[in-house]
Amino acid sequence: MKSYNVLPLAYISLFLMLFYQVWAQFPRECANIEALRRGVCCPDLLPSSGPGTDPCGSSSGRGRCVAVIADSRPHSRHYPHDGKDDREAWPLRFFNRTCQCNDNFSGHNCGTCRPGWRGAACNQKILTVRRNLLDLSPEEKSHFVRALDMAKRTTHPQFVIATRRLEDILGPDGNTPQFENISVYNYFVWTHYYSVKKTFLGTGQESFGDVDFSHEGPAFLTWHRYHLLQLERDMQEMLQEPSFSLPYWNFATGKNVCDVCTDDLMGSRSNFDSTLISPNSVFSQWRVVCESLEEYDTLGTLCNSTEGGPIRRNPAGNVGRPAVQRLPEPQDVTQCLEVRVFDTPPFYSNSTDSFRNTVEGYSAPTGKYDPAVRSLHNLAHLFLNGTGGQTHLSPNDPIFVLLHTFTDAVFDEWLRRYNADISTFPLENAPIGHNRQYNMVPFWPPVTNTEMFVTAPDNLGYAYEVQWPGQEFTVSEIITIAVVAALLLVAAIFGVASCLIRSRSTKNEANQPLLTDHYQRYAEDYEELPNPNHSMV
């Protein structure tokens, strides 16, 4: 590459800051004693006269340091331990001041752009397209697999994770912040774990498990949307490829096989151990993080960057639970998209006629709640029968990415059809973390559920290339068609008889087209599952 001009160091620094988007729990610049004790995370963008001279890019008008706004509206009674969890009123227990960016600027120091924008001034609109993994060319498939593996092995250039709760965050001596580096992909796993972990109530006490900041409530779709957007942007930056996009897995096939579980894609089943991935796949070498639940729950520690055992996966292999041995039907998606109301009281896993609860998979595809049902998103996770079916571990299996991009595609189609009607996304009394204006845990800078409740092509810089299945006829419609067909047949017979009576001349026989196609509506007998109200994925 030829270079004819030498750019000033400040411009080079600005370019690098624009290139690396900040989405971490906390930026590395704020993981220090001074920032934690002050409760201020407003890093400089281009400090020209020493530290603290350009917080949030204020000198160039990109942003300013302001007080954090956290939702204070009441949550539901499912969580009775107010004051015990660092995730409450996120992120006020850690920081009370952060950057507020102007215009299309974004990031922890306003050094980058909002989703859908790029360029030094963040004034160039960009749209990436998420496509079906199976529709990609061989080169595109290989590139995606290599990119995932690179993300697994690349230390995040900007972000660190906390390995202790707030009361122990400064270490035993009070001067050693407990943060660690982590890879780009393992950070994706860690954020999911942190959102679903139990609330530690103290040494010798059982941790409280009926809490989940990203499942079983209205924030399920908005939280996972941002989670994916974070990974996509991180990988774009890692690859230096702004057009890179995450593909999806259309799991609504009705089949008992995983069509993306091949060695050139997500890995086939090992011939040596049916619960492992084939050694011919790069993913057989991956090791999981965040698996030491007993340690976290009894000692009050957090998941760190230590990797453990391999990914386990045995699609359709749970012979003891036939209901999870087959993937959702295409028609399940069609029916789900006909549920017009986003969410309904009690805004939990037992909500009925709720689009959110239906696509999450706690209701039947028609929207009717049934405690024995696991459908759509939940069924796809359970079908994988391994790491991908355990809530705290599921993102360790990279199929998680593909499964959730398709779930997000369904969400985006619903938003398009119903004009992003947020009126039934509750402002209060949802499970903790799920109120409309709650800052989603543990993302940084703070971002609310509302900000993700928008159509993606117009607001978030990406779109889906997907063909939705058509609507089958319902039983009542089939009966109506049959009645109409019978009446037409009677009318035709009567007409022919009348003609024969009126005229004895020989006439050519005419064929009357009839509606004789057989339409079968999808139905499946779901087995009752243990703990039906507990989040499985």
From Swiss-Prot:
SUPFAM superfamilies found in the cross-reference section: Di-copper centre-containing domain
Tissue expression notes: Pigment cells.
InterPro entries linked to this entry: Di-copper_centre_dom_sf, Tyrosinase/Hemocyanin, Tyrosinase_Cu-bd
Cysteine disulfide links: C30-C41, C42-C65, C56-C99, C101-C110, C113-C122, C258-C261, C290-C303
Entry's cofactor comment: Contains bound zinc ions after heterologous expression in insect cells.
Entry's Gene Ontology cellular component terms: clathrin-coated endocytic vesicle membrane; endosome membrane; melanosome; melanosome membrane
Subunit structure: Monomer. Interacts with ATP7A. Interacts with SLC45A2.
Disease involvement: Defects in Tyrp1 are the cause of the brown (b) phenotype. Brown mice have a brown or hypopigmented coat.
Protein name per the record: 5,6-dihydroxyindole-2-carboxylic acid oxidase
Organism from which the protein derives: Mus musculus (Mouse)
Gene from which this protein is expressed: Tyrp1
